[in-house]
Amino acid sequence: MSEGKKRSRGGLAIISPPKRRSQRKSTSDSPIPEPIMKRSITVKKIMPRKTLAAIVNTGSQSTPKVSNVPPAPRRSSRISPKIQKENAFSEQSQIVHKDVPGQSSAPKINVLSPIPVNIQLSPKQDNRDIIMSQKVRRSYSRLEMSLNSSSSLYSPTRKTDSSDTSTPNVVLKSGRSSLFGFDKLLNSEMPDGELKKSNGVTRKKNTKERILGTVLPEQPDHNIPGVVLAKQKRRKRKVAIIEKSDLDEWAAFMNAEFEEAEKFDLTVE
């Protein structure tokens, strides 16, 4: 026993571990947390420009004021945030009317747009513009009348023309619409007789081409500077000449076959 006491007194003392406390006792010793502060947040709905302009136009009209009416109870943002978003603009307008009861003007709204609210949609037209628009309408109506009416109403020999526009009132005898005065340019170069002849020749050519079913290719232009075109030698195809006697024999043979076919009696059972 004396040796153990000497060792402990000598400086090398054995340190025992600290005792662990239960959780029930430790919770009572911990500091109390601070209470959480709740803050109210105001939410504003961003309105588009079109609806803002429409609301300003409707708000400018004078409306009768109703007195002795209790205001609607306002709800907190925590209970119904959606309702506050929808009715934010109407509540602001009611507050402005309560603050300024003497003024009958609409509340001023800061519209965040470069386009001003009070825009004249239909600017005043000049007298000249109105007259020109009437003339244009009259010209179109006269053109429709000239196309749809008979040639007796608007004859080409008529000298007096009361129209103030440049559209013609002439209808040809054939019933076709006029070329707005350009038909004179077509007929000015050649007289009527030559024009009729040329039209007849072109019609004959077109009928021949339709019958043959082939259009002759255009001949190449040999007068090209710096280009030498080799002449192509084309051989003419020899067509076999059929004699008249052979044609008569073929015709007689075909006629005999047709007669036999007509005499044959077909019986269907």
Curated annotation (Swiss-Prot):
Record's protein name? Sororin
Where it mainly occurs, coarsely classed, is nucleus
Q: What does this protein do?
A: Regulator of sister chromatid cohesion in mitosis stabilizing cohesin complex association with chromatin. May antagonize the action of wapl which stimulates cohesin dissociation from chromatin. Cohesion ensures that chromosome partitioning is accurate in both meiotic and mitotic cells and plays an important role in DNA repair. Required for efficient DNA double-stranded break repair.
Region annotation (C-terminal Sororin domain) maps to 247-269
Q: How is it modified after translation?
A: Ubiquitinated by the APC/C complex in G1, leading to its degradation.
Which Pfam families is this protein grouped with?
Sororin_C (PF25220), Sororin_middle (PF09666)
What family does the Swiss-Prot or TrEMBL record give for this protein? Answer: Belongs to the sororin family.
Q: Where is the composition biased (Polar residues)?
A: 57-66
| Highest taxon of the lineage | Eukaryota
Free-text note on domains in this protein's UniProt record: The KEN box is required for the association with the APC/C complex.
Q: Which gene encodes it?
A: cdca5-a
Keyword list (alphabetical) reads:
Cell cycle, Cell division, Chromosome, Cytoplasm, Mitosis, Nucleus, Ubl conjugation
**Where in this protein would one find the motif KEN box, according to its record?**
85-87
> What processes in GO biological process is this protein linked to?
cell division; double-strand break repair; mitotic metaphase chromosome alignment; mitotic sister chromatid cohesion; positive regulation of exit from mitosis
Whom does it interact with, and what assembly results? Answer: Interacts with the APC/C complex. Interacts with the chromatin-bound cohesin complex; the interaction is indirect, occurs after DNA replication and requires acetylation of the cohesin component smc3. Interacts (via the FGF motif) with pds5a and pds5b; the interaction is direct and prevents the interaction of pds5a with wapl.
Quick one: where's region Disordered? Answer: 1-39, 56-110, 146-169
Membrane-spanning intervals of the chain: none
The record, for InterPro entries, names: Sororin (IPR018605)
Q: Which GO terms describe its cellular component?
A: chromatin; cytoplasm; nucleus
- What is the annotated localization of this protein? Nucleus; Chromosome; Cytoplasm
Question: Which residue numbers does the motif FGF motif cover?
Answer: 180-182
Query: What segments bear the compositional bias annotation Low complexity?
Result: 146-155
